[in-house]
Amino acid sequence: MALSKAKGNDGKITYPPGVKEISDKISKEEMVRRLKMVVKTFMDMDQDSEEEKEQYLNLALHLASDFFLKHPDKDVRLLVACCLADIFRIYAPEAPYTSPDKLKDIFMFITRQLKGLEDTKSPQFNRYFYLLENIAWVKSYNICFELEDCNEIFTQLYRTLFSVINNGHNQKVHMHMVDLMSSIVCEGDTVSQELLDSVLVNLVPAHKNLNKQAYDLAKALLKRTAQAIEPYITNFFNQVLMLGKTSISDLSEHVFDLILELYNIDSHLLLSVLPQLEFKLKSNDNEERLQVVKLLAKMFGAKDSELASQNKPLWQCYLGRFNDIHVPIRLECVKFASHSLMNHPDLAKDLTEYLKVRSHDPEEAIRHDVIVSIVTAAKKDLLLVNDQLLNFVRERTLDKRWRVRKEAMMGLAQIYKKYSLQVEAGKESAKQISWIKDKLLHIYYQNSIDDRLLVERIFAQYMVPHNLETTERMKCLYYLYATLDTNAVKALNEMWKCQNMLRHHVKDLLDLIKKPKTEAGSKAIFSKVMVITKNLPDPGKGQDFLKKFTQVLEDDEKIRGQLEKLVSPTCSYKQAEVCVRDITKKLGNPKQPTNPFLEMIKFLLERIAPVHIDTESISSLIKLVNKSIDGTADDEDEGVPTDQAIRAGLELLKVLSFTHPISFHSAETFESLLACLKMDDEKVAEAALQIFKNTGNKIEEDFPHIRSALLPVLQQKAKKGSPRQAKYSIHCIHAIFSSKETQFAQIFEPLHKSLDPGNPEQLITSLVTIGHIAQLAPDQFTAPLKSMVATFVVKDLLMSDQLPGKKTTKLWVPDDEVSQETMVKIQAIKMMVRWLLGMKNNLSKSGNSTLRLLTAILHTDGDLTEHGKLSKPDMSRLRLAAGSAIVKLAQEPCYHEIITLEQYQLCALVINDECYQVRQLFAQKLHKGLSRLRLPLEYMAICALCAKDPVKERRAHARQCLVKNINVRREYLKQHAAVSEKLFSLLPEYVVPYTVHLLTHDPDYVKVQDIEQLKDIKECLWFVLEILMSKNENNSHAFIRKMVEYIKQTKDAQNPDDQKMNEKMYTVCDVAMNIIISKSTTYSLESPKDPVLPARFFTQPDKNFSNTKHYLPAELKSFFTPGKPKSTNVLGAVNKPLSSAGKQMQSKSSRMETVSNASSGSNPSSPGRIKGRLDSTELDQIEYEDYTMISSPLSGKKSDKRDDSDLLKSEVEKPRRGRKQPLIDPDDSFSMDELSKPAQEPKSRTSQRGRKRAAAASESEEQAWQEKRLKEDLLENEDEQNSPPKKGRRGRPPKSAKMAISKEEPPVTTPKRGRKNVVPIESPPTDEEDHLEISEEQDSENIDQKRKGRGSSKKTPQKSDSTDSALDTSRPTPQKRRGRPPKTPTVQQKKSHVGRPRKVVSKEPESEEEMEISQNSPALSENISNEEETADEEVVAPSTGRRRTAKKRRWIQRMKSELEGPLL
């Protein structure tokens, strides 16, 4: 190479060939040109050119002069920087610059030039890139390690590179920057805090969002230098976290964000930092804990995080924060739980336990977010959440807060739609969440209108999406309905019913609006608006909005027309969509984004629009059912057995025929139904009949060919079909045909003539058919019906036992195990009731006779003839039938008037029957009549006796029914304010007098001052009063108190002269008064209204008499705890300790219940076995669980399961102390005097409970009994099986001799629950007995006295020593106990023919048409004979001979002759 003259060692600068001197004397352009040549020269040189290195040394020093480093032109500076970079490369490892200051200036200069990398579009960018590449490759900056100010140089370099990096740079730029910076970290001795900050600052979220490339650069750098930089990162966090030296860095406040980012980049960077977080989690500073929890939530939930498995102590410590005292911390834990569930399924088990607790958190937001987290994970993949987690969401659908309930319901709905309605989800997933559809529909039982509306919306959008095509929509509905459980089906049916009712209300409103304006019309419109408002959320605002909407309807004819079309029965789904859209568009205001008025109207339109059902939909649904019938449907693929699909489809059509009857009016639909009617399947035919009944009113006119084909089928079903088919056939004929009388005659005549007790199956159908004809056409067959009832139904069916029943200890068996003869008798009873309900009058006194017959069945425990042929389950069925029949007749005013108080009281006692199913079904009948406002108010008082039910679920369900009935009446009175004349029969508070009267005559209430019996009275009263007093509306507490005070001024109208009965009544009043005083603070206020007591139950108050006496024993007053009634939970309490709920105090009585149950040999669920009380803690627990839905049929499931297994197990294992035992004369049977004796005899005729008896004893007996109970308490833990029952029981006392009754204290007549009649010795003859002679009365009194002292008996362990002296007056009287009483042996075991005295059932005949019982019945002669024998024994005292006085024989003969008239 030719060189310019220069000498390196004499300080002269040698330039490359062709390059002249570079100085400030040349222009910028020339300088740039010459520098480019210099750059080219240095670029081509390598480290091995020692000669050239020496030659250009001075040039290298010259280029580092301040002239170049501070040159104003950027091109000059860039070229100089490139030269310097090459010089460092060429002279490496030693630089030609020895001055530290110069080196610092040079590197600071090069760093400044690197800023040119920012503009990737610059023409000089390649030269900047060359500069970066050169210094990165050579690691030129490593020279600075020797400098004192190296930290400043490195920090500036890092900041420069992080600031210039952008998305215009390619991977090479990124790589060189990482190489350059990593060499400084990896090869340096230390990393200063400033340098570390320059890297970490790019990880802070704010910076990260501003420059993503800088974040990526920092991330790459940290990954590259992880091992080298980790100690400095650890030191930084130690200083900040542990020592609190936040001043060491500006990033101290972002420490938790940095930990998260560093963990995501490389977890090894924090190996020593993470243990410090465990310490921070336990900090006393709430905010600090919150920050750590936020951090760890993200770290544990990150997708690829292994932190939980790598650091288990930290994970466990973090889980502990789910229970932190600070609400935001718990909230944060719950919020991020979904990430852990979604990204780490293995952590679900740990999280489940903590989410369970948080799902009951007192804080609403936390419970809400638990649901959100679980639902979010479930929507991603159902496998991520276990059944337990889904159950937490399920529980929260009953939360007390609407926001939480809504989130839970919507979450379940979304999960259901995703996995049940989408085929790709798979059958397994659909199976796992199959319960959701049932649960969501169950919520429709809630009282809250918001819940109900949301269920409707969920059903329309998620369960059966309304936007599907008609065929798909109906298929979805068809198979949904087929797989719903019973209660969900009821809820869905109720939903359609409510929507249909609201549709009719809106239609009525439109009709009222169209009428000319009048004052009455305005009131009617207002009333209708109020009714509709109750079907909308927020009734307060809803009322105002609906008034406004009513005004719009009056003014805008177009909107009114659209609404009329919408509520029209012929409106199709597509028309409904158009109408809703047009109305909302017209009412909407674009300038008002949130319009509460429009939202409310949308709610209304959603509820009334037929979004699912129209004529096309019904046709499509019937085609689906037909496909299933033909076997061409894909039922099995849908997971539904074909038979189940067909029945469900027809059931669905049946329900829709109620709510959308017009949609069925097509020939195709009716022809399909006719085909179903001819099928062999009974259920299918039944459903088809019901659909015809509901929709067929136009068939005769519009579809004559259907009418012609239908008539013979209906006649055939009425004569030969199943009982239900026969019933619906008659109703179809009544609904469809105008010439129904002719059709009825063609059916009635042959059936009437061919009634055959020998063919019970056909006889049942005939009785059903005739019964319904009698009800629908009572005047058409008056004479033959009356004759048939008298001669056939009563005489041949009810009073005749053909075959002996199966011997069993069970009290109930399934329907298919009930004997045909019993089923016939039940239908006979129903037929008589239907006949009476059809007549609706008692002119022929048939009602009186029937009521006497029904009460006789109850008296005789269901075995009317008392031949002993009937099995116990059959007797239970007949008791239920008789009780239900009386309740049915009581709903008709003309028959309610003739039901005597004794008959009413006897009917009431069926609610305490020993058979669980009898109690359950009778309660349902009672509730049905009460909720429809058909039964008089006194029948609501029967609910008070449910407090004695031993089954907790039965008590809870009875309470629900009572709550609903009280609310129904209050709601009715609010809506019909003008019905003041009905106030006495509707105001719920008026149930109190009836309850007091009923409890006064309760056969369990024997001794006026008995503490245990009064406790039971208290429980029964509180059962009713608790609900009545839950709200003090219109000063009702004072009104109830005043009512009770009024009763104490009256006498018992049933037995006005019976001092003991009146004293009982006043004692019950005192119990009620104590309850009122202890549970209310406003009882002492003056009631604005004066109560009116029912004259049938109470005499007129004696204004001259002030009854201020206190009748309660002092010991009982301690049982009335002061304070207000405990408020009941409506929805699930949050974080409530459930373990203590439902526990009863372990009192003496509760222990006695347990022992009593253990030692008795019968059904543990019957009142005769145990009698628990429903205390307040039980109530809370019940309401927390499933009893929040007032009208819900869900309650009682547990007891249903026990019906045939648990409840009956003890019956099979242990002999139950039955009503009839071998000591009773087998010939002893039902006699005719039962049906003819006067039914209302003051004092002597008191209400009884069929199968249960009670009697009183002397004071000495009571004391002895108390002493015996104390001894038994001491022994009860030693031998439960052998210890006697200690719980009071409804039953008769042990048999003792006549002389055991003290002369000073005459025996007390007590109400008894049995078939035996007791006439007190001191009772004077009544007017109805004037025709009897005095001696005859005395004889009858002697008989009754004897009966009281004797009666049937059977030895039991607890009575083993009862055969002592007949004169032992200290013999204890066992306390009452529900169920059949234990039998005790008579005092003298002589040959005793024990008669069966009975309670009087009816009044004296008022007409010649009286009940007739065949003289051929063995019950008559045998029973009379037994009574005569018993009477003779009693008269002659201990003599074993039998004598019959002439007067006695004459009296019996007279009684026989009086019963020989016609029955009806």
Swiss-Prot record:
DNA-binding region of this protein: 1287-1299, 1375-1387, 1391-1403
Ion transport listed as a keyword: no
Example of a GO cellular component annotation carried by this entry: chromatin
Acidic residues biased stretches: 1177-1186, 1325-1342, 1425-1435
Principal subcellular localisation of the protein: nucleus
Skewed-composition ranges (Basic and acidic residues): 1197-1215, 1234-1244, 1265-1274, 1455-1464
CDD domains per UniProt: PDS5
Listed Basic residues bias regions: 1286-1295, 1347-1357, 1390-1400, 1441-1453
Region (Disordered): 1126-1464
GO biological process: cell division; DNA repair; mitotic sister chromatid cohesion; negative regulation of cell population proliferation
Chain intervals with Low complexity compositional bias: 1156-1168
This protein's record includes keyword Phosphoprotein: yes
Post-translational modification: Phosphorylated in mitotic cells.
Biased composition (Polar residues): 1137-1155, 1359-1373
Keywords: Cell cycle, Cell division, Mitosis, Nucleus, Phosphoprotein, Repeat
Record's subcellular location: Nucleus
One term of GO molecular function: DNA binding
HEAT repeats: 383-419
Family: Belongs to the PDS5 family.
Subunit structure: Interacts with the cohesin complex.
PANTHER family linked to this entry: ANDROGEN INDUCED INHIBITOR OF PROLIFERATION AS3 / PDS5-RELATED, SISTER CHROMATID COHESION PROTEIN PDS5 HOMOLOG B
Task of the protein: Plays a role in androgen-induced proliferative arrest. Required for maintenance of sister chromatid cohesion during mitosis.
Name used for this protein in its record: Sister chromatid cohesion protein PDS5 homolog B-B
Species this protein is from: Xenopus laevis
Gene: pds5b-b
